[in-house]
Design a protein with these regions (language model features):
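A short acidic, Gly/Pro-enriched loop at the edge of an enzyme's catalytic core
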Residues: 102-113
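A short SAM/SAH-binding and catalytic strip from SAM-dependent methyltransferases
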Residues: 113-125
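Short glycine-centered segments of the SAM/dcSAM-binding site in methyltransferase folds
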Residues: 51, 141-142
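Class I SAM-dependent methyltransferase SAM/SAH-binding core
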Residues: 53, 59-103
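Conserved class I S-adenosyl-L-methionine
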Residues: 1-47, 61-65, 144-166
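A short glycine-rich, Lys/Arg-flanked "PGG" loop and its adjoining helix->strand segment in the class I
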Residues: 127-139
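Conserved Class I S-adenosyl-L-methionine
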Residues: 33, 178, 183-267
């Protein structure tokens, strides 16, 4: 199962296109204004002099934005995606490395702040990853982990799962494990001296069918369909029909609850 999860995550992030679409949706279609990066910086008491590690950095925007804002401490990112590392490598002021969260290619006691945003639910052994985060943080350091609520955007996820199960003869392992807002505090409490939690609730709101379809197509791998699956076109056609019919009947908007937690662990 662990190998299957790792393979599903690797396939998902061979390209960053689906990730960028999901980020677009949360940035442009959240019901209430919200900036996760701002919240992470605030909850971690991040200072410009801090040495920062971002694990599972994805597009690298968090580190790029810190550098652009004049951050003076070291900025290091580790990701399992070769595409992500290649995209960030060479960016001024940022050290991008290929590596696993459960075996970080970094020395002990190296960072003031360790950040892991929206990635722990992609890891085969979350507890091992948390122990690694603690290992590379300094005395007095802080680790900030962000994960989604347990049943995020249930409307669109349920619809996509139904179509994947209907069209794909042998759905694969979803590219996520079972870590979420409700169980992360206990996982971190077993590793860190003290854990603080901030929950953020919101919704995704789509006013047009094309907006919802774009997002739905970007979460298919989270529902067991590989990005290169031959059934992908059939799934997208069915989703197009269902989404168009829903808007014809209801007029919109499509509103789906979502949320996340920021858990801060003190070393």
């Amino acid at each position: 199962m662990n190998d299957e999860l790792a393979e599903a995550v690797e396939a998902e992030y061979t390209s960053l296109s689906a990730l960028r679409i999901r980020m677009w949706a949360h940035r442009e279609h959240s019901e209430f204004p919200d900036d996760v990066e701002v919240n992470v910086r605030a909850e971690s008491d991040l200072l410009a002099r801090h040495d920062v590690l971002d694990v599972g950095f994805g597009t690298g925007d968090f580190l790029k934005n810190l550098h652009a804002a004049g951050h003076s401490g070291r900025l290091v990112g580790v990701d399992t995606s070769e595409s992500a590392v290649a995209d960030l490598r060479g960016h001024p002021g940022v050290d991008a490395r290929l590596g696993s969260a459960t075996d970080l290619p970094l020395p002990d006691d190296a960072f003031d702040r360790v950040c892991a945003r929206y990635m722990l639910y992609h890891v085969s052994d979350p507890s091992a990853a948390l122990r690694e985060f603690r290992r590379v943080s300094r005395d007095g350091g802080v680790t900030v982990v962000v994960v989604n609520h347990a049943d995020v955007v249930p409307g669109v996820m349920g619809m996509v799962r139904e179509e994947v199960e209907r069209h794909v003869a042998d759905p694969g392992v979803r590219a996520v494990n079972s870590v979420h807002s409700d169980n992360l505090p206990d996982l971190m409490g077993a590793v860190f001296r003290r854990v603080r939690v901030r929950r953020v609730d919101n919704s995704l709101v789509f006013h047009e069918p094309a907006q919802l379809l774009r997002f739905a197509g970007a979460v298919t791998s989270m529902c067991g369909m590989r990005p290169d699956a031959p059934e992908r076109d059939a799934v997208i056609r069915s989703l197009t029909t269902r989404i168009s019919s829903w808007f014809e009947r209801n007029g919109g908007p499509w509103r789906d609850p979502k949320g996340y937690s920021i858990c801060v662990g003190d070393r």
